[in-house]
Design a protein with these regions (language model features):
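Short acidic capping loops at alpha-helix termini that bridge into adjacent secondary structure
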Residues: 179-180, 211-215, 270-276
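Amphipathic helical "hinge" segments at domain boundaries
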Residues: 27, 34, 43-108
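Hinge/beta->alpha junction and helix N-cap segments in small-molecule ligand-binding domains
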Residues: 67-76, 97-106, 158-168, 184-234, ...
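N-terminal helix-turn-helix DNA-binding module of bacterial transcription factors
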Residues: 1-58, 355-361
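Short, well-structured alpha-helical segments in soluble
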Residues: 104-116, 230-244
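Flexible loop/hinge segments that line or gate small-molecule binding clefts
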Residues: 122-167, 254, 280-293
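Flexible loop/turn connectors
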Residues: 232, 236-361
């Protein structure tokens, strides 16, 4: 088997140059890189990443830790990956995707064995043991979402303004004349859930009002059923019990689809009799929605790109300032499509041929 010395000799360069071509630790000209790669291919040379990691104590692997729902990824998660992967490729890192089951907080011991240089953590929860575990092991981390408690000042994170966004989309529904707005939210232990609840309440407070009791529900048991099934069953029962509900706000597109199915079963026309709005926009489920769904574009790809860049700053910079906790807020947009209308609207009052309109959320 060819060695790095063989490649260097055949290519007429130093061992260090060959090493840098493969590790991308230092910039090498395009011409030299292509020449070395061609020689390596001819010699059938493959770098031994694990041997190298034992020497420099670096694996050049980034961990991405997220919760999976029965092995299905959401559009948000796909978009986030599309933001992370190109940066990893350009900077010579590999990505280890950890999709733990919903009870991942009891599986932190698995994270300790991950051969990663740093970790990106998604779906932050209150008292997140994943964050504490990484801090104790001195593993650089970036959280996508808001860390809870003192972690907010101890670790870098990337987030949307979830309080402000939830307030604005709720205000949008209120401005359309809706007063009974059902909010099908995520698990109560997630920080994003708490922030969106706060924004929802804030919108009513700004109008000098309070939402009716029982208008906020949470899917706390993620193992019992999918988000779609939960929202379908919840919307079906709540809309039957309370016909005064004229709008539903959901945590995800999948939940919104459940509401659409419940509305169809109850013969409620969207948006004439029921308005639906969700956090999330334009995903793989988009073709399932008729009329087109109004939603919030969270720009998950930008969240992913910013998160990996913050993490690589910690890994590659020696300046202490680059290791300080930083916060980045990614703006979101309300994309108005065909699923929301005024409470007093008449059938067919919404022109479905109009293109979606974006409003800064």
């Amino acid at each position: 088997m060819a060695t790095i010395e063989d490649v260097a000799k055949a290519a007429g360069v130093s061992k260090g140059t060959v090493s840098n071509v493969f590790s991308k630790k230092r910039p090498i000209s395009k011409e030299v890189t292509e020449h070395v790669m061609q020689v390596a291919k001819e010699l059938n040379y493959r770098p031994n990443y694990w041997a190298r990691s034992l020497v420099n104590k670096k694996t050049r692997i980034i961990g991405l830790n997220m919760r999976g729902e029965k092995l299905k990824m959401s559009h948000f998660q796909y978009s986030l990956l599309n933001g992370v992967l190109p940066v990893c490729y350009e900077r010579g890192y590999r990505l280890l995707l950890n999709t733990l089951s919903p009870n991942y907080l009891n599986q932190v011991e698995h994270l300790a064995s991950d051969p990663v240089d740093g970790e990106i953590i998604l779906d932050a929860v209150i008292g997140d043991s994943r964050v504490e575990d990484c801090l104790q092991r001195n593993v650089p981390i970036v959280v996508i979402g808001r860390p809870s408690g003192e972690d907010e000042t101890r670790v870098s994170y990337v987030n949307n303004d979830n309080i402000g966004t939830a307030a604005k989309v709720t205000q949008y529904l209120i401005s359309l004349g809706h007063e009974q707005i059902l909010f099908i939210n995520g698990p109560e232990n997630r920080t994003v859930t708490a922030d969106r609840t706060a924004g929802y309440m804030q919108a009513f407070s700004q109008q000098g009002k309070k939402p009716a009791e029982g208008m906020i529900v949470h899917q706390n048991n993620l193992q019992a059923m999918t988000s779609l099934t939960y929202s379908y069953e919840t919307a079906l029962s709540r809309l039957k019990e309370n016909p005064e509900i004229t709008a539903v706000l959901t945590d995800t597109e999948s939940m919104a689809l459940g509401v659409y199915k419940a509305a169809a079963e109850l013969n409620l026309r969207i948006p004439d009799q029921l308005s639906v709005l969700c956090f999330g926009y334009g995903g793989t489920l988009a073709q399932e929605f008729n009329p087109p769904l109004t939603g919030v574009d969270l720009h998950a790809d930008k969240l992913g790109t910013e998160a990996i860049q913050l993490l690589l700053e910690q890994l590659e910079q020696s300046d202490a300032e680059d290791k300080l906790a930083k916060r980045t807020i990614i703006p979101s947009d309300l994309v108005v499509r065909g699923s929301c209308d005024r409470r007093e609207s008449k059938p067919d009052s919404v022109d479905q041929t109009q293109p979606p309109k974006k409003i800064k959320a």
